[in-house]
Amino acid sequence: MASSIWKGLVGIGLFALAHAAFSAAQHRSYMRLTEKEDETLPIDIVLQTLLAFIVACYGIVHIAGEFKHMDATSELRNKTFDTLRNHPSFYVFNHRGRIMFQPPESEDCHRNQAPFSSNSSLKLSKLEAMHR
């Protein structure tokens, strides 16, 4: 029920804002006809514009709901440590590490091949040594 009240308030504010814009345009055309183009808008149009803007903004703020906290702890509270810095889109497996970190006995057989050749199999010898 409360959200329909705020939506109605926003509707009234926007309607009043459109009415104020129409009144300002009508006043300007009247000033052109009377050749008094240097006069400002009447105070009632200015006040209607400001009041309509405030009413529309007040209704929009209540429709938007609860604001989030600005500190980072509120966003990080529901994340685990494993997913905090885990970015799978940055994983790269085709890099120069497979050539640089080969065991010394296999370096001699691969010296004739060009580095980063596509036909050589992907060897993660450094990771294999860590798992042993």
From Swiss-Prot:
A GO term from the CC aspect: Golgi membrane
Segments passing through the bilayer: 4-22, 44-63
UniProt keywords, alphabetically: Endoplasmic reticulum, Endosome, Golgi apparatus, Magnesium, Membrane, Transmembrane, Transmembrane helix, Transport
GO biological process, one term: magnesium ion transport
UniProt subcellular location: Endoplasmic reticulum membrane; Golgi apparatus membrane; Early endosome membrane
InterPro entries on file: MMgT
PANTHER family attached to this UniProt entry: ER MEMBRANE PROTEIN COMPLEX SUBUNIT 5, PTHR21181
Subunit structure as annotated in this protein's UniProt entry: Component of the ER membrane protein complex (EMC).
Similarity-based family: Belongs to the membrane magnesium transporter (TC 1.A.67) family.
UniProt protein name: ER membrane protein complex subunit 5-A
Species of origin: Xenopus laevis
Gene designation: mmgt1-a
